Structures are given as C-alpha cells and as structure tokens.
C-alpha cells in the first residue's frame, strides 16, 4: 500500500514556479494517473493549487 509523502500542514516548495516560494499542504487527494495529488497554498493566497507529488519538494527550514 502506498502512502502520501507529504502531510497536511507541511511546508513544501513547488518546483514548477519561476519564483521560489514556500507553500503549505492543505489537503491530500487520491492517487490519479499513478501519482498522489495535493492541494497547496502560498501564504497570503486565497486559492489552492492542485499539484502532483513529483512537483513538490520538502521546504528547508529557515
């Protein structure tokens, strides 16, 4: 059985953006096309992005 790599509330970086930014995982979504999906939100934003697990990296603590 496979599990999500990231957890709700975890800080991640989204690697497909041109500007480096830290996002927070807001929801875990089911697997689609062989990959887990997530809702992520940037601080101060009002909408979530839906992204695949391969597009995320764990954010470094500052």
Task: List each language-model region with its residue ranges.
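Short coil-to-beta transition motif at edge beta-strands of beta-rich domains
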Residues: 3-15
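Short glycine/serine/proline-enriched coil/turn segments at secondary-structure junctions
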Residues: 31-33, 48
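Short beta-strand-centered aromatic/proline hotspots
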Residues: 20-30
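Short aromatic-glycine-enriched beta-strand elements
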Residues: 35-39
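Intrinsically disordered, low-complexity, charged/polar segments
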Residues: 41-62
């Amino acid at each position: 059985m496979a599990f999500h790599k990231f957890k709700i509330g975890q800080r991640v970086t989204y690697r497909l953006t041109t500007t480096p930014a830290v996002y927070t995982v807001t929801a875990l979504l089911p697997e689609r096309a062989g990959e887990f999906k997530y809702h992520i939100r940037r601080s101060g934003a009002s909408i979530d992005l839906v992204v695949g697990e391969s597009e995320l990296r764990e954010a470094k603590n500052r």
